[in-house]
Amino acid sequence: MARLILSLDGQVLAEYNMSKERYTVGRLPDNDIRIDNPTVSGHHSLVINILNDSFLEDLNSTNGTYVNG
């Protein structure tokens, strides 16, 4: 099972077990993973899990989406 680790400046803020196929990420409360930070768009990105692979799609967020960065 995939796992998403949310960190800031090397400090782990949250960990999520990714058991579903799709997760929305953003600042608004209707997202599966909510990040309450002004640099995160309301509907920021989408995580898609297919078999043993995970894909991250930016949803035209203002500040972009980065992996390991």
For each feature predicted by the language model, list its residue ranges.
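Forkhead-associated
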Residues: 3-5, 12-69
